[in-house]
């Protein structure tokens, strides 16, 4: 079995990330979704995510197999939600954006590893509420988040001229004790960088 792990994306990952994103854009278009069909996200989006250390890559056998952005600051488009409400509207939350699995690895369960690791990183930052949004035609993403017990909370609008409405999901984890001591030293470098 190949080594599979999550790490922060680096500038040298940008070409691999963009290949994955371009493949995802084509798949979304093929599946009838207007999501990501207006030039977003682009290379500058991911360069910014890498610069702010919010983009993560799932590595499988030394290759970038998946990418996602874990934003720990409030998402402006989540201020206004219709057809529902956030369960924890005033609590801190992390937003998971731009989730994509390489076409070379689709169907291998890597989305579970990616989400599990992102939730762990968020929890290590003291976050227990996570949000994500996706287009109503993006059935694959809906399936992934619903399998992780994200609950559909309503509709938000993003800056997309084609179709701005997105389904808004939220996961509220129980109260956990703050991590104060780590026995497995192989994780310490990652934790120290958070």
Residue ranges and their predicted role:
Residues 1-12, 175-194:
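Conserved N-terminal entry element of GNAT/NAT acetyltransferase domains
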Residues 25-45:
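Conserved GNAT-fold acetyl-CoA-binding loop/helix
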Residues 69-100, 106:
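Conserved acyl-donor/pantetheine-binding loop and adjacent beta-alpha core of acyl/acetyltransferases
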Residues 101, 107-120, 143, 147:
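Conserved acetyl-CoA-binding loop-helix of GNAT-fold acetyltransferases
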Residues 106, 132-142, 160:
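Conserved beta-strand-loop-alpha-helix junction that forms the acyl-donor binding cleft
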Residues 112, 124, 136-154:
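Conserved active-site alpha-helix within GNAT-family acetyltransferase domains
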Residues 115, 122-134:
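Conserved GNAT acetyl-CoA-binding A-motif
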